Amino acid sequence: GNPNLPGHVLLTGRVTGDKWAVSDGEVHGGARSIGAGGLPPALQAQVVNDLSRPVANLDSPLAGNQPRWLEELAAYNRGFASRHRQVAELEARSRTFDTAYRMQTAAPEAFDLTREVADPATRSLYGLDPQETRSTGTKLLLARRLVERGVRFILVPSVSVPGGRGDWDTHTPAQVREALPKLALACDQPLAGLLTDLKRRGLLDQTLVVWGGEMGRGGPGHMNHNGNAFCWWLAGGGVKPGFAYGATDEQGFAAVKDPVHVRDLHATILWLCGLDHRQLEHNGVGFDSTCRVAHGMIA
């Protein structure tokens, strides 16, 4: 990874016109969606909801005195740590300060899309001109820049699209008819552009792209939450292209052929990232959440 940039970035907000509209700061799922889970707190997500200010307070008011102030703070923290046990959160906060200092020079360049969006070919590839694809395309273009610069994990939520109801939380036929075509349009070209761009830059083989949601639809009219049948797609990162695994019944209510448990999916993603799920264990609140496999690897 790049020590001058965060290892985990969440790109939220929406692009309207030529500006990155600031979201309200809320992330679906709350802190669990951006936290580090069982990993050190320093690995939680850096939330970017305003491209003009990707990192809050990035400009230092201390100017030339900043290195001295940071060293004094580090010395104080080391002294505190030497007198107290179990100071993982303090260590994580200290590393966060160090990263923030280094980001003052690296982040402005990484998040600057000026030259990218001036290229007509890039604008066409990511769909930056049509209103329907501009928001997703801009964030995926930024995600590609972060991949190039060594950011290890980037999350791009599929947010609502302009014009009426436009999110994935559809529970009536009317909502599906209104939202689904817009959402598909917003995602299709930008995602294809991202994969094309990563491949031609030689980055796709070492970058795993995952697209999916948290559930399918079932019940009367296919309008209810359904955790028994839904699909994800993976590309790059060693995934075999053109490979499909599993199938649902004719109604899409249940997986009936080669069903994949979510733990299988997690294990597969970890394996593609070079991690052995059997070596990972997190003792959470009264339970052992080791990533176990029910049916083995799927890719």
Per-region residue spans from a language model:
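Ligand-binding pockets and gating/stacking loops
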Residues: 1-299
